Design a protein with these regions (language model features):
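N-terminal hydrophobic/helix-forming segments and targeting peptides
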Residues: 1-302
Length: 302
């Protein structure tokens, strides 16, 4: 990053095809440190939603300050609530911060986090943007789009090939946390990006509040849903578990009921909520809930 005056001076003195040698006058200090902020709100269940944002470039209002402002507002809101899934908030330097945080907490993250959001560039007044997780099947992918649709807001939906922020690290091979990036104007695609025009005139309290409400509602939607996860490998032997009397599915033969339960288990990977499983296996929601309750009772799902 250079000042506008420095850039102007270079453009006046040199040709477009000029080459420069860059000297980085620094040393690696093994005793150095990297600081980040972390705040955890415990839920009823062990599973967690990760909320990450970054703070590293100085003086940029939308790119650097809007994410932490909305994130701190989320902390203030949810710490007063009773929640089902834990909320883990992280404020880090972009890229190197995410890599460092993952390095230090990988086992905990992969064990507990089942979805989440990377929040950036949420202070301007343009349309919303979200980048889906790598496999496009994360609860955060579904919830953010459901909220934007229900609010009838204009938005752009992008796949993971359009990544560019910390979702690169959180969704990388060996990590795969199912993180969705949420923005207004997408980073690196708005004229003010990484310029002095990304200032307090470019963002507004109104836009920050609107963004806060969208992401808050998305988190609350995830909190309100049940995401079954199969606790065994391969199909279970159901006969010995005496499921027939406990599943109330009228008008279906024993064979059909067995197939429904096995179908339910196939989609119980922690990413599909009960309503989506119900739609997928073509079963009434009330019947799907009965299947879930039974499988939970005999510890085939969590």
């Amino acid at each position: 990053c250079v000042s506008h005056e420095f850039k102007k001076n270079v453009l006046e003195k040199y040709e477009d095809n000029s080459f420069f040698d860059m000297k980085i006058d620094t040393k690696f200090n093994h005793k150095g440190n990297l600081r980040y902020g972390e705040y955890f709100i415990k839920g009823k269940k062990d599973k967690e939603i990760l909320i990450s944002t970054y703070l590293c470039h100085p003086s940029m209002a939308n790119n650097e300050l809007s994410g932490p402002i909305v994130t701190m507002s989320l902390i203030d809101y949810f710490k007063k609530k009773k929640i089902n899934y834990g909320l883990r908030f992280v404020i880090i330097p972009e890229t190197i911060g995410a890599i460092s945080y993952i390095h230090k907490n990988l086992k905990k993250l992969t064990r507990n986090v089942f979805c989440g959001f990377n929040i950036t560039c949420v202070g301007d007044s343009r349309n919303y943007t979200f980048i889906k997780s790598k496999y496009e099947n994360s609860p955060s992918d579904y919830s953010i789009e459901d909220v934007l649709k229900n609010k009838k807001l204009k938005y752009t939906k992008l796949n993971f090939l359009k990544r560019g922020s910390d979702e690169r690290q959180y969704n990388s091979v060996g990590v795969n946390l199912g993180i969705t990036t949420f923005s207004r104007s997408k980073f690196d695609e708005f004229p003010e990006y990484h310029t002095s025009l990304d200032n307090f005139d470019f963002v507004s309290i109104k836009s920050l509040t609107q963004s806060f409400n969208v992401i808050k509602d998305s988190i609350e939607l995830i909190q309100s849903r049940i995401y079954p996860k199969t606790q065994i490998v391969c199909e279970p032997f159901l006969t010995k578990r005496n499921f027939y009397p406990e599943i109330n599915i009228k008008g279906r033969k024993f064979k059909d009921k067995t197939k429904l339960i096995l179908d339910f288990l196939q989609y119980s990977d922690g990413n599909f909520d009960l309503k989506k499983i119900s739609k997928k296996i073509k079963c009434k929601y009330s019947e799907t809930k009965d299947i879930y309750k039974y499988l939970l009772k005999i510890k085939l799902v969590s």
